C-alpha cells in the first residue's frame, strides 16, 4: 500500500516548481490531485501525470475562483484530504523604493491567496472529516535576508502566523496546519537549474553549501500529509539546507 492511497489533494501553483514536484510525489504515493494554476500550465501537469490529476485554472486572489476550485475537487473526487497552498510570487526592491501597487500585488498573492486557500480549505476539510493544510511560507518569513525582499518577507511571516492560528483553532476538529519554509530552492521563480552558480552568496549561507531541489520539498510535503505525521501540527518547518541555522 502506498503512503497516500485513497487521499485527495488540492495543490495551487501546480503548473511549475515545488507545486508540480508535489503533484508528482503525491501521485507516486497513490493520491489523486486537483492541480490548480493561473498560467494554464496546470494542463501540462495533468498531461504528464495522467488520470489521477484534474487541472483547474484558478487565480488564488479571487475568492469566487478559490471556492470553485474546492467545488471542482469535490465534484471530481468526492472528497479532499489535503490542501497545499503553494502559489506565490517573488518581488525584490529596496524597501524605500517599493511602490504601493507592488506592495498590494505581493500581499494579494502571497498572503491573501494563502488565506483564501486556508479558509475555504478548512471549510472543505471539515465536511470530509478533517485533513491537512500545508501553507508555503519561506525562510524569508523567519529571518531577514541579504536580498531586498522586505514585502515578500512580511507576507511570508503573515503566512506563518495565521497557519499557527489555524492549527490551534481547528486541531480538535481534525485539521492539522503546517507552514513549510523553503530556502533557496532551484525553481523557475529563483532562476531555474544552475541558479546556485548565479547566486553563490545564497549557497554559502547554507550549511550544505548547495541549493535545494523542488523534489526535496515535495518529499516533506508527502510525509506531512500522510498518517505517519498525525501528531505534527502548528509547526514551522524550514527546508533550507541549514540556512536558518547559520543565521540563528
Label the predicted regions.
Residues 171, 176, 232-234:
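Short, small/polar-rich loop/turn modules that mediate ligand/substrate recognition or access, typified
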Residues 138:
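Residue(s) in the substrate-gating loop at a strand-loop-helix junction
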Residues 4-34:
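Canonical Rossmann dinucleotide-binding motif of NAD(H)/NADP(H)-dependent dehydrogenases/reductases
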Residues 143, 222, 233-248:
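Short C-terminal tail/terminal secondary-structure segment
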Residues 94-95, 102-107, 202:
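Substrate-binding pocket helix/loop in short-chain dehydrogenase/reductase
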Residues 118, 155, 163:
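Active-site helix of classical SDR
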Residues 123, 168-169, 230:
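Alpha-helical segment proximal to the catalytic Tyr-Lys
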Amino acid at each position: 500500500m502506498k503512503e497516500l492511497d485513497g487521499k485527495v489533494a488540492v495543490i495551487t501553483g501546480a503548473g511549475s516548481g515545488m507545486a508540480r514536484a508535489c503533484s508528482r510525489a503525491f501521485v507516486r504515493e497513490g493520491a489523486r490531485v486537483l492541480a490548480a494554476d493561473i498560467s494554464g500550465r496546470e494542463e501540462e501537469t495533468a498531461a504528464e501525470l495522467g488520470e489521477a490529476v484534474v487541472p483547474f485554472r484558478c487565480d488564488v486572489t479571487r475568492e469566487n475562483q478559490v471556492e470553485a476550485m474546492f467545488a471542482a475537487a469535490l465534484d471530481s473526487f468526492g472528497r479532499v484530504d489535503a490542501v497545499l497552498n503553494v502559489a506565490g510570487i517573488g518581488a525584490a526592491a529596496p524597501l524605500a523604493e517599493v511602490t504601493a501597487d507592488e506592495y498590494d500585488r505581493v500581499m494579494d498573492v502571497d498572503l491573501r491567496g494563502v488565506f483564501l486557500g486556508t479558509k475555504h480549505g478548512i471549510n472543505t476539510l471539515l465536511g470530509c472529516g478533517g485533513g491537512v493544510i500545508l501553507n508555503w511560507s519561506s525562510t524569508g518569513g523567519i529571518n531577514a535576508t541579504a536580498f531586498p525582499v522586505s514585502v515578500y518577507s512580511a507576507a511570508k511571516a503573515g503566512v506563518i502566523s495565521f497557519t499557527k492560528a489555524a492549527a490551534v483553532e481547528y486541531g480538535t476538529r481534525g485539521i492539522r496546519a503546517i507552514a513549510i519554509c523553503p530556502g533557496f530552492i532551484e525553481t523557475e521563480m529563483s532562476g531555474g537549474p544552475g541558479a546556485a552558480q548565479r547566486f553563490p552568496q545564497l549557497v554559502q549561507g547554507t550549511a550544505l553549501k548547495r541549493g535545494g531541489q523542488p523534489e526535496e520539498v515535495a518529499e516533506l510535503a508527502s510525509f506531512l500529509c500522510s498518517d505517519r505525521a498525525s501528531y505534527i501540527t502548528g509547526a514551522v518547518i524550514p527546508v533550507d539546507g541549514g540556512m536558518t541555522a547559520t543565521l540563528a
